[in-house]
Amino acid sequence: MAQQTPSCKPQACAIQNCLFSNNYNESRCDQAINDLYRCCEKFYKETNSKGVTPCCPKPDLLRTKMTQRGLQEE
């Protein structure tokens, strides 16, 4: 049986690649981080916050992080 790729893994990997490429300067990877958080938000909406993926913070922490970054939905 084929293993399924965890939700939002490409976005999580993009953050790792960005950090590596930018000498671990997180401020240069804001877009990649925002993309991951948006992906995670979509994932949790689709699973009624019951889905599990190693690539995303828990739903409560995700909401906090999105609010801090001004990414909350209107």
From Swiss-Prot:
It is found in: Mitochondrion intermembrane space. It holds the Pfam family CMC4. A motif (Cx9C motif 1) lies at residues 8-18. InterPro entries: CMC4, Cys_alpha_HP_mot_SF. GO terms for cellular component: mitochondrial intermembrane space. Keywords: Disulfide bond, Mitochondrion, Repeat. This is Cx9C motif-containing protein 4, mitochondrial.
